[in-house]
């Protein structure tokens, strides 16, 4: 397994797919990286030369990926919660942040249902 940005990427897959195992690199970014490095997308990781791997590592090193990106995202969320804006309040309460309805759905954000006891008449 080749190691890029602290992540072991699978050897038997195509390079463009293997790069997506790194947090912060999706398919479009992987394609741009390979184009800049001058590596074909169809190449398997096991067939890469050390020189090609070095070029890919250098390009990925310039991007914000893995731990740095995770830290930035969590700090952004923490900042929103501290300044008390609407999005921060939604994060604090564990509700959807982007305006989705919460009457019926939003179970992923709200967690499992908590049944409320009915008042007897």
Swiss-Prot record:
Q: Which UniProt keywords apply?
A: Ribonucleoprotein, Ribosomal protein, RNA-binding, rRNA-binding, tRNA-binding
The UniProt entry, under Pfam families, shows: Ribosomal_S13 (PF00416)
Q: Specify where the region named Disordered lies, as residue ranges.
A: 94-121
Q: Which GO terms describe its molecular function?
A: rRNA binding; structural constituent of ribosome; tRNA binding
PANTHER family under this entry?
30S RIBOSOMAL PROTEIN S13/40S RIBOSOMAL PROTEIN S18, SMALL RIBOSOMAL SUBUNIT PROTEIN US13M
Q: How does it assemble?
A: Part of the 30S ribosomal subunit. Forms a loose heterodimer with protein S19. Forms two bridges to the 50S subunit in the 70S ribosome.
Name this protein carries in UniProt: Small ribosomal subunit protein uS13
Q: Which InterPro entries match?
A: Rbsml_uS13_C, Ribosomal_uS13, Ribosomal_uS13-like_H2TH, Ribosomal_uS13_bac-type, Ribosomal_uS13_CS
Look up and give the organism this protein is from: Geobacillus kaustophilus (strain HTA426)
Q: What does the UniProt record say this protein does? A: Located at the top of the head of the 30S subunit, it contacts several helices of the 16S rRNA. In the 70S ribosome it contacts the 23S rRNA (bridge B1a) and protein L5 of the 50S subunit (bridge B1b), connecting the 2 subunits; these bridges are implicated in subunit movement. Contacts the tRNAs in the A and P-sites.
Q: Give the lineage.
A: Bacteria, Bacillati, Bacillota, Bacilli, Bacillales
């Amino acid at each position: 397994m080749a190691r890029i940005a602290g992540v072991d990427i699978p050897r038997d897959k195509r390079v463009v797919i293997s790069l997506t195992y790194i947090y912060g690199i999706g398919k479009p970014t992987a394609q741009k990286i390979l184009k800049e490095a001058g590596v074909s997308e169809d190449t398997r990781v096991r067939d890469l030369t050390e020189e090609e791997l070095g070029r890919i590592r250098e390009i990925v090193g310039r991007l914000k990926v893995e731990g740095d990106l995770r830290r930035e995202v969590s700090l952004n969320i923490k900042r929103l919660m501290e300044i008390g804006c609407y999005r921060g309040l939604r994060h604090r309460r564990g509700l959807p942040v982007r305006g989705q309805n919460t009457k019926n759905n939003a179970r992923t954000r709200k967690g499992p249902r908590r049944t409320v006891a009915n008042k007897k008449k």
